[in-house]
Swiss-Prot record:
Its EC number is 3.6.5.-. PANTHER family: DEVELOPMENTALLY REGULATED GTP-BINDING PROTEIN-RELATED (PTHR11702), MITOCHONDRIAL RIBOSOME-ASSOCIATED GTPASE 2 (PTHR11702:SF31). It comes from Beijerinckia indica subsp. indica (strain ATCC 9039 / DSM 1715 / NCIMB 8712). GO terms for biological process: ribosome biogenesis. It comes from the Bacteria. This is GTPase Obg. Keywords: Cytoplasm, GTP-binding, Hydrolase, Magnesium, Metal-binding, Nucleotide-binding. InterPro entries: G_OBG, GTP-bd, GTP-bd_Obg/CgtA, GTP1-OBG_CS, GTP1_OBG_dom, GTP1_OBG_dom_sf, OBG_GTPase, P-loop_NTPase. Mg(2+) binds at residues 173, 193. HAMAP family: GTPase_Obg (MF_01454). Its cofactor is Mg(2+).
Amino acid sequence: MKFLDQARIYIRSGDGGAGCLSFRHEKFIEFGGPDGGDGGRGGDVVALCVEGLNTLIDYRYQQHFKAKTGTHGMGKNRAGARGADCILKVPAGTQIFDEDGETLIADLTEIGQSVCLARGGNGGFGNAHFKTSTNQAPRRANPGQEGEEMTLWLRLKLIADAGLVGLPNAGKSTFLSTVSAARPKIADYPFTTLHPQLGVVAYGDREFVLADIPGLIEGAHEGVGLGDRFLGHVERCRVLLHLVDAGCEHAGKAYKTIRKELAAYGNGLDEKPEIVALSKIDTVDAETLKNQMARLKRAAKRTPLKLSAATHTNLTETLQSLLAAIDAAGAAQEAAAEPAATSWHPCD
């Protein structure tokens, strides 16, 4: 499936139905009076967060969406039916912005969450609505109210338990394909991964979602190599697994490059829990591995893990560390969401 994390769409809610101009016609009743019903309300345009989606690719092929118009009112005081809503199905993590691309309208992060983007127009009043003691036969009815129209931006930030970050060709895609059923493109050259990939990792009786973020380079926070869009996906990850290629020139410098970009992007990316690992250790000799581990340890100020997805070396330890970090991050989020307990005293 192709990946699309940004789309521009045009929406319009339904117009309200017109009120009816009608009079009661029955045998032996000469002046039956008005009986025109009201028009139905137009349909709304609603964005709904659904499961089973992880891309906005559907909005590449259709960008115009319109809800149905309300039915016109009818005689015998029959009101028109309400117009059908237009439902925009989006994946969890979708943000909806105004046409300027900066004003946030909604942030849909949970399955089942919805937001009304454009409200349908009200139906017009039929002539029965205008009957008074001094005007027994009104000959007026209102047209329906026009619907709302607007242009919006949809932006997707993938929601995952853990995210893989690192320089291009650090072994992220190989790691994801080894520990999950995801099958990203893998090749021995930089920028093989051009779009974020999601995989479900099963470990024991537990499962968690792992995101492979395309390789970041220096200047990513300024948009170099589409890095600013890729960094946006990191925002929704609870934990980061930072992979550093053991075969790179200097593991410490490679680590600091990514940390610098996370800090420069902001939004707390550099404050997220992080597990550091030296990857592709099967590609270097023992002496090089020792030197790279020492450099990475000095830069990260912690003892990094070392692994090889190709030979399945230390994958179990890495997944255990990831699960522990995910659980700790989840507990911290729940604790922060709970209201602070207040002590009660009868004299207060």
